[in-house]
């Protein structure tokens, strides 16, 4: 049985619904692991999954055994991680520990590129970060996923939008996460299956809602709808030339800054 990992966030449960419910033809049975993306990054590091959602920030350490698929990505515009604090201010003025959702997340890599002088950093589950910021346990927090839509309800203020910064710096969309498959897997099958699952979800969004709500941190329909709209885009159907350029720009610039190992050309599976 194929092991498949993805997060319980609405964008992932939405796009994988058809695949995991047997609605895509000629797909072998899957054993699903639902876990936050940093846990999936770690599982992939231990070669523990056949196909998995991954942070693009984790990819440089994994390419010996895995290749990125062209469908299933979270790439877009206006969807970047935010740095939040209890009081309004400037990112460069933050003094003290910053909560992060993991050291292999793309969000953390973007923060290191944007403000290399900041730190120390305190890794924790992404949904714990707003609470710790509000309680004064950390000076600021790097937020992703559903917390991007709910931080203001906790009285927090955005100091920086790292996606906006990235788009201004590069002119490219924000590459957050993608799908890895083991190089010895049937790559063509999984690219087809995931693309068909994405297309099925776009065509039948109401059918996915119960499964999405079952696993979401936030149950309000407007939050779920905003989450899916922001992170499931045309790039999710197929990464395309622009999306691939965004991923390569992230990995190349991070390697130049000595934050990640250098990646060769064989990052994405062929179309």
Language-model region placement:
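Conserved C-terminal helix/tail region of periplasmic/extracytoplasmic solute-binding proteins
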Residues: 253-271
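Bilobed "Venus flytrap"/periplasmic-binding protein-like clamshell domains
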Residues: 2-21, 34, 80-139, 144-149, ...
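Secondary-structure end/capping motifs
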Residues: 184-253
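Pocket-lining segment of extracytoplasmic ligand-binding domains
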Residues: 125-214
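A structural signal for short loop-to-beta-strand junctions that line the ligand-binding cleft
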Residues: 2-3, 65-73, 96-97
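Hydrophobic residues within well-ordered alpha-helices
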Residues: 44-45, 133-134, 254
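Hydrophobic/proline-rich hinge and linker segments of small-molecule sensing/allosteric domains
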Residues: 68-90, 167-183
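Beta->alpha turn/N-cap motifs
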Residues: 36-38, 47-60, 125-126, 142-149
